[in-house]
Amino acid sequence: MTTADYRFCPRCARPLTERADPEHEGGRVRQVCPDDVCGYVHWNNPLPVVAAIVELDGKILLARNAAWPEGMFALITGFLENGETPEAGIAREVFEETALTAEQVTLVGVYEFIRKNELIIAYHVRASGTVALSPELLEYRLVDPPLLRPWRAGTGYALADWMRARGLDFEFVDRPGQ
């Protein structure tokens, strides 16, 4: 969420103002409640997102979200639940979205996705089972790892790092699924 998304204080409903206070916020402009008793500051911190490079029978599962254009396939992603570790969160997301069971979950890396104000925690997930997509996904592909083509945004960098660690050559594409 960007600061433009907030117009009113979520605590007391007063209109928010902007403040740049080098002592408290390092000089960054923040939206704040003008009521000193309330004291709300909208920090606009990045949202943690988990992503999975799902490996099933030696192939990587890429899926198309129902909201995406035809031909656009990417990694399984999702948000953490309160009190959930990232490892448990990605195992849950993989199961919820594909019905696959995470057998092994290994950290690939942590990546910025500034455009969406997200911090992506990416994992390689070795999975088992039979794919059954959730309603939010329309279709999937199982791709041989050497044929993967990472994209220059968000989870694409995680896929590139995973491929690089396995000695796989690749070229970046503009968007997922190309």
Question: Which stretches of residues belong to each language-model region?
Answer:
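Conserved Nudix-box catalytic region and its N-terminal flanking loop in Nudix hydrolases
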Residues: 46-49, 55-96
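Active-site-adjacent beta-strand/loop module that shapes the phosphate/pyrophosphate-binding cleft
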Residues: 111-132, 145, 162-163
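A short coil-to-beta-strand element that immediately follows conserved catalytic motifs
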Residues: 19-20, 100-109
